Amino acid sequence: MRRVRKTVILTKNVPRLHPCAAAIFVVLVCASAAAVSSDDRNLAETPPMGWNSYDSYGTTINEAQVKANARWLADHLKRFGWRFVVVDMEWYVTNPTPSGNSRNSHYAMDAFGRYTPALNRFPSAANEAGFKPLAAYVHSLGLKFGIHILRGIPKEAVEKDLPIADSDYHASQAADRSDTCPWNPDNYGIAANTPAGHAYYLSIARLYAAWGVDFIKIDCIASHPYKGDEIAMISRALNQSRRSTLMSLSPGAAPLDKLDELRGHAQMWRISDDIWDLWHSEKSYPQGVGDQFSLAAVWAPLTARGHWPDLDMLPIGRLGPSPGWGPPRQTRLTNDEQRTLMTLWSISRSPLMIGGNLTEMDEWTTSLLTNREILAVDQHATDSRQVLDDGRTVIWLAQTSDGDGEYLAVFNRAENIQVIERNWKDLGLEGNSYRLRDAWEHKNLGRARSLKIQLPGHGCVLYRVSSK
C-alpha cells in the first residue's frame, strides 16, 4: 500500500553548477577531506556527557520540552561536566506517534529534500530558520546542541526528484532504492561513493552547520546494517561543512573488525543495541544492564582520546511522558542496579547520555549524576580493563589520572547477596595492603590486606585504592 505523505516545501534560489564543475567539486571535496581532521580529538577529548530526548519523549519531543530540559541541565548539571542537549529521532514529523516509525508520517522538508523541524512542534523554525534559534538558545545556556538523523535521503524527496542544493544533481541520482533501514521507513540509502550522494550529504552537513549543530547522532548505520561507505561519506561532508561537529553512530553492536574505520570517522559509536531499564533480556532488543559486561570488557581497552565505544543511554529517573519503549514510568532498575549502571559505564569510559526526564528529576537520580568521584573515573581514568569475570563476580581496574593509585570496581552479577573475597595479587595488585576510599559514599575505609566485601544482588562498589 502506498504511504500517505504531506510535505512542507520551502523555496529559495541557489547557485547552480555546471555538471562537470559539480563533478570536479565533489572530487575535490573527497580529496581534501584528509586535510581536514576527520578524527578531531578536540571534539571529544573525554567521553561526551549530556542528555538525549529519546528515553523520555520518543519521537514526540517539542521545542518547549527541549528548552525546559536544557534549562534544568544548565542549572543543575552543567557544573559537573554535562554539556550536550540532543533532540532524538523524527523531529521533522508533523504527526508523531508514541510508538514512532509510523508508516503514515507527514514530513517537514525544504525544497532540496532536506528534513526541517516540524513547525507545529518547533515554532521557532519558521521562516526557514530551522534549528538555528533553538541551537542559539541552548548555546546561550553554555551548552551544546545535537540532533538525530537517519542515514540516507528522504523517500519523498526521491519520489519528487527534488534538486540537491548547490549542485546540478537531483535526489533520484543520490538514492539507492534497494537500500532502506529495516526498522524505519523514512529514507532510502545513499548510492555509495557517487557524486550525487556526496552532494546530498554535503548539503545537509552545511545546513546543520548553519543551524549551529554541535553533535549529530546518525542512526541505522553502525549495525544491522553496518554502512561503512555512508559513514565515510558523512564524515567527509561534516569536515567540509567547516563546523566542528561530533559524530555519533548508532545502533550497535558496531563490528569490532571495523575499529579502524570507526576511529577514522566518528567520536563515539554504539557497541550494543538499545539499553532499557531491565537487568537482562533474552531478546536482542532491548538489552539490559547486565548484558553489557562482556561488551564493555572487549571494547574498553580500545578507547582512545577522541574515540569512545558507547554503551548507550542511561535509562534512569522518570521515563516519560512518551518513552521510546514501553509505558511512561519511573525506571524499573533498582537503586543497586542504577549504581551498577553508572559504575560500569564510568570505569569502561563510555559516553554518558541521560535518558530520564530532567524536569521531573528526583533527589536519588540527581545524586547519581552529580557524584564527582564517579564522574572523574569516566572522564579521566586510564588503562580500564576487566580483570575477573567468573559468572557471578566481575572486577575491573583502571589507573587514576594522577598515577597515584587504581580504581577498583567490584560487581555482583548474581541476584542474591554475595560475599566476595580476593587476594590483591589475584587482581594484579602487587602490594601487601591498600588504602581504600569508597567513591560512592565519599568515605575513607582505611587499609586492607585483601578484598572482602558483601554486595547485594546486582550491586557494586567502586574504590580508589592506593598503596601509600
Residue ranges and their predicted role:
Residues L143-V158, S223, N239-L256:
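Aromatic-lined carbohydrate-recognition surfaces of secreted/lumenal glycan-active proteins
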